[in-house]
Amino acid sequence: MIQITVIQIDNYGPWTVTPNPRRESDLQALQSRLYADLNLMFGAHKGLVFYTRFDNLIAITNGIDLITHKRIQESIRNRYPFTVSMVIASAETPYEAQKLATETLQEYGSAQDENRKEVLDVANELVVDGYVQIAHIDINNITGTLTDIVSAYDTYLNVNKVKLALMEELLKYNALLFFIGGDNFMAPSNGMSEEDFLDIFNRINKKYKIELKAGIGIGRTAEDASNLADIGLEKIRGKLVDKNVCTLKQDDFLESKMGMGKIYHPQF
């Protein structure tokens, strides 16, 4: 089971134009700061936040309880000129979890309802003994094939084409995908196999002539899974595996490191 928290700024659209439209540069900076602060706050508890549309964010929050969510919510109220609402849900797949959380939040009223403030609810249950699977996907040799050859905007356009293709393909497996900068994407993907990813990569390569690779991490929290995914991706880059996917599981990884005589102090 994966635990997802949907985060939404309360009544944000009307606030941006009241009493007059606010400077766009200020709004962009404010949204970026909120994303950064939320990642730091949830990250302190081994969670991970993705910005989606900036006024609506999705966080992977396995291991994070309701009290911690409440404290984060209060901290945002104290730091920002607006409030946020949060709903937590769990499911076998990321898409199912975020959908359930979203539907529960919508039951409290519109995102632009001035009377709906600081909703905090659990749609079904908090995850006690679940896991997180995250794939860190990137484009093979984007520097040599795009960055150093075509314009900055054309590279950006191609990256977004790949992003959309990945989002549509992964949705067939009830997985999610988020852009995380450069040519990198992260996909919460509980239940997917390496073969599923290879099939998707082959279809995208046939259509766009772009090769992809992915480290896949499976851990108890978003931080554990994403760290393992990063290590798996480095194994592919270092040609330590013979295919474009590499899966690392938390317990297996810790056992292999301990067996090499290294001392680890995992925080579970």
Curated annotation (Swiss-Prot):
Cofactor(s) needed by this chain: Mg(2+)
Transmembrane segments: none
InterPro entries (UniProt xref): GTP_CycHdrlase_3, Nucleotide_cyclase, Rev_trsase/Diguanyl_cyclase
Keywords: GTP-binding, Hydrolase, Magnesium, Nucleotide-binding
Catalytic activity: GTP + 3 H2O = 2-amino-5-formylamino-6-(5-phospho-D-ribosylamino)pyrimidin-4(3H)-one + 2 phosphate + 2 H(+)
Keyword Transmembrane helix: no
GO MF annotations in UniProt: GTP binding; GTP cyclohydrolase IIa activity
Note: This enzyme couples pyrophosphate hydrolysis to the guanine ring-opening reaction. GTP cyclohydrolase and pyrophosphate phosphoydrolase activities probably occur at independent sites.
PANTHER family with a match to the protein in the record: GTP CYCLOHYDROLASE III (PTHR42202:SF1)
Protein name listed in UniProt: GTP cyclohydrolase III
Gene name of this polypeptide: gch3
